[in-house]
């Protein structure tokens, strides 16, 4: 993993919800994330380290309440960890660069992958490919 800022530095940089999600493996309430309904063309990055994670053309409305994607930008973008918390068996997804918690991946997504990367808006930043505008979840 790349050098990650200290917890103190991150607490200054991130909102309380962003810190909770990315550093404490938290989950934002469904249907509340700023990037859930974003339909612009561009790239979704890790909020903590700016690593590109997902292209907008892989985003879709799964109805689950969090931004959903069917494929990351590269194999290196995402780290996968078996998660047995809360009495469930899931696969946690983290940033492949800084290890920030992003969400979980499920095998119920659309083709071509059949996967649903269910990602907290609070873990993402978005860069608009047309005008360079930045949005943070």
Curated annotation (Swiss-Prot):
- GO cellular-component terms in the record? cytoplasm
Domain MsrB as annotated: residue spans = 7-129
Reaction it catalyzes:
L-methionyl-[protein] + [thioredoxin]-disulfide + H2O = L-methionyl-(R)-S-oxide-[protein] + [thioredoxin]-dithiol
- The residues that hold Zn(2+) are 46, 49, 95, 98
The record's section on PANTHER family has: METHIONINE SULFOXIDE REDUCTASE, METHIONINE-R-SULFOXIDE REDUCTASE B1
NCBIfam families attached to this UniProt entry = peptide-methionine (R)-S-oxide reductase MsrB
Official protein name in the record: Peptide methionine sulfoxide reductase MsrB
Q: Which organism is it from?
A: Salmonella agona (strain SL483)
- The gene it comes from is msrB
């Amino acid at each position: 993993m790349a050098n990650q800022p200290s917890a103190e530095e991150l607490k200054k940089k991130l909102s309380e919800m962003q810190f909770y999600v990315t550093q404490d493996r938290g989950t934002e309430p469904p249907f509340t994330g700023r990037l859930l309904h974003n339909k612009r063309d561009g790239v979704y990055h890790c909020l903590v380290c700016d690593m590109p994670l997902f292209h907008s053309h892989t985003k879709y409305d799964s109805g689950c309440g969090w931004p959903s994607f069917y494929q990351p930008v590269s194999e290196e973008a995402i780290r996968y960890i078996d998660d047995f918390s809360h009495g469930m068996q899931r696969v946690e997804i983290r940033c492949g660069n800084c290890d920030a918690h992003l969400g979980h991946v499920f095998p119920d997504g659309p083709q071509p992958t059949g996967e649903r990367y269910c990602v907290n808006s609070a873990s993402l930043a978005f860069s608009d490919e047309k005008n360079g505008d930045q949005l943070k979840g």
